[in-house]
Amino acid sequence: MNWNPHPIAIAGLAMLSLPMIAEAKIYLSIEQAQKILLPNKQLNKMPMIITDDLQEKMRVASSIRHPFQGDRIWKTNDGSWFIVDEVVGKHEMITYAVGLSSSGNITGIEILEYVESYGYEVAEAQWRKQFVGKNANDPIKLNQDIQNIGGATLSCKHISDGVKRVVVLYELALKHPLVQSKK
C-alpha cells in the first residue's frame, strides 16, 4: 500500500516545519560606537582574563549566565572605559557597548547588533538614555530604575542585567587594577 498525500498537505507540513528566521540588524560597528560614546578620545585595548571567581561575582550581581569575554575592553587616557558585551535576548544574542566615565558612571550605551524578530525598540535612544549616570551602586533592574518596553520585555531585562554586569566588572576589576610590583 502506497501513501499518496495531497500536495496541499505536503505544502502545509513544509510551512509548519520552517523555522522562524530572525533578521540580523547591525546598527553600529565597534569603531562607530566608540566615536559616539567616547568622542575625540584615543582608546587603548585592555584585554583581561576573567577569572572564574570574577565571572561568578558578575553572574551573582547580574543573573547573566553567558560568560563575559574579556577581550573587548578599551580604556582612554583620561580613565574612561569602552566595553562590548553580549546577552541573550529572547532566543538570540544582542551585542551592545557601554561607555563608562573614569569614576564608573555610565556615559551611554549603544546597541551594536540585534538578531531577534521582536524587541528592536531597545535600540531607541529614549530607552537607552535611562542608563546614563548609573553605576554599580544602582539597581539597574527592569521595572525598578529601568523602564520596560512592551513587546521587548526579555530584551530589556537582559540588556539591563548585562549593563549591571559591566558596571560590576568596573567596580571589581577595572576601578583599581592589580599592579604588579617590580622587584
Task: Give the positions of each predicted feature.
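Cleavable N-terminal signal peptides
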Residues: 11-12, 22
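Bacterial N-terminal signal peptides that target proteins for export
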Residues: 1-9
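N-terminal signal peptide c-region/cleavage motif recognized by signal peptidases
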Residues: 17-19
